[in-house]
Structure formats: structure tokens, C-alpha cells
């Protein structure tokens, strides 16, 4: 069994991700569970009944506490001085933004006890059928973690 998890806010849902998640429903095998965590209410049923919506703040009160604790800390908000601000490395100091991703994964991991738990960024648009055989190649049974490696300094964490 596969569970694909993502998180986003309502603005991102309306701008692009609604179409993207619809493509997941069309191209992933029917037995794949699709879970969307958001801090905003999103009517996913209007897109596809297969998408499961979960309120991120209800599922992860620790995220709310984390954001409150670090709301004024520039190292958690992407403002670490002129040297990094506005550069490609600024993401390293956007802990609050990326915490939504990690807390969504952690929340879902607490309730899933079988199969693969897979993070997929909400900006992914699927254009080709992903068969069960293809997923088995991406996520081999003899491995516990899979991700998209790439040359250079940073790995791709949009699919893990």
C-alpha cells in the first residue's frame, strides 16, 4: 500500500495545486491513498473524492507551538542578513515554511502502520500513468527510504 502526503495553504491550492492533485488522482493506481494536510480548510471533494483532507494544525499542535516559539527569529523566517537573503541558499533559513512539510509527514506516520509513506510536493503535475510496477521500482521492498538523488550539493526532496 502507498500513501502520498502533501501540504499546502489555500492560496497555493487555488493557484496551482488543485490541478496538480487532480492529476495524481488520474495517474496514480487506484489503491494509492492521497492525503492533503493544510492549515486552511480546503474542499477537496469538489476536485476528487479520493483526496483526504486533514487540518494540519489540528493534527500537529506541535507545529503551532513551533511557529509561535520562532515567529520572531530571523533564522527560522528566511531573514539571516544581507549575505543570504534573496539568494538560492536562503531556503536553509526558512524553518517555519518547511516545518509544514515535516509535521505533515510526522502526523501521517503516527497513524500509518503498513506500506510506504511518500511525500510528494504539491507543485508536481503528473502527466503519465504511474503503474504499481513503476512505484515498486521507485520504492524497493528491501529499502526503508527512497528519494531522488541528484548531482551537486542538494538532494531533491520533492519526492521522498
Segment roles from a protein language model:
Residues 34-39:
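Short internal beta-strands
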